[in-house]
């Protein structure tokens, strides 16, 4: 069993609750504000201590790049699925999406996963396999399984799944006076501006959770 200090346990529990509630880990600034640290640097020190103890993994340069590994009590609350007897959702896993066809077309479904609904902030309709690192700083990495709820509308600031012509992308939505912007959470990627009424744009859904691969 990994031994944590009281403060480290608070940080670990905060990360766990944030992921359970929103599907994503908190930023250093959010940890500092929640726990009353003087600065985000203080949160960073505790995160590094947790990483040294092997209970989390940090992604360099990513504000939300925190992955929970084994907890101090080997807690199964993050990224691991509960025993089959309490699994309630059967979610299709979507791999690559062919140009011009619906996301949930049968040919896109590679398999189904049984998942505990408590893993998600709202009930998802499917899992989408993430390609690339454009959302790295939101804690979304290549190969992750993004839980998606089908929606044709989204709130400002939500992480959305959008269709742009023949492509499907995951970005953070930001409304602008004459359209909207799809924001990448990685400075190596460009944001995408979409004019109001663009026929090339369609909102497919919103992100309601995240599962790491290999944890089923």
UniProtKB/Swiss-Prot annotation:
Catalytic activities: Hydrolysis of Ala-|-Gly bond in repressor LexA
The entry's keywords: Autocatalytic cleavage, DNA damage, DNA repair, DNA replication, DNA-binding, Hydrolase, Repressor, SOS response, Transcription, Transcription regulation
Keyword Acetylation attached: no
Pfam families: LexA_DNA_bind, Peptidase_S24
Disulfides per UniProt: none
Site (Cleavage): residue numbering on this chain: 99-100
EC number(s) reported in the record: 3.4.21.88
Any single GO BP term: DNA replication
HAMAP family on file: LexA
Oligomeric form and interacting partners: Homodimer.
Protein name: LexA repressor
Source organism per UniProt: Paraburkholderia xenovorans (strain LB400)
């Amino acid at each position: 069993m990994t031994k944590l200090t009281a403060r480290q346990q608070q940080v670990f529990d905060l990360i766990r609750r944030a992921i359970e509630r929103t599907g994503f880990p908190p930023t250093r600034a959010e940890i500092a504000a929640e726990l009353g640290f003087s600065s985000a640097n203080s949160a960073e020190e505790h995160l590094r201590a947790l990483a040294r103890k092997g209970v989390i993994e940090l992604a360099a340069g990513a504000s939300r790049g925190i992955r929970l590994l084994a907890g101090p009590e080997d807690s199964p609350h993050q990224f691991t699925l509960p025993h089959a007897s309490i699994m309630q959702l059967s979610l299709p896993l979507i791999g690559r999406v062919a140009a011009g066809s619906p996301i949930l077309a049968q040919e896109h479904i590679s398999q189904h996963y049984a998942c505990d609904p408590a893993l998600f902030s709202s009930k998802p309709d499917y899992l989408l396999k993430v390609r690339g690192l454009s959302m790295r700083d939101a804690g979304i990495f290549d190969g992750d399984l993004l839980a998606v709820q089908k929606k044709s509308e989204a709130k400002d600031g939500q992480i959305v799944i959008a269709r742009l012509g023949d492509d499907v992308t995951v970005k953070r939505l930001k409304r602008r006076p004459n359209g909207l912007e799809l924001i990448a959470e990685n400075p190596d990627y460009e944001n995408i501006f979409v004019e109001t009424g663009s026929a090339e744009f369609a909102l497919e859904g919103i992100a309601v959770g995240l599962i790491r691969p290999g944890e089923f």
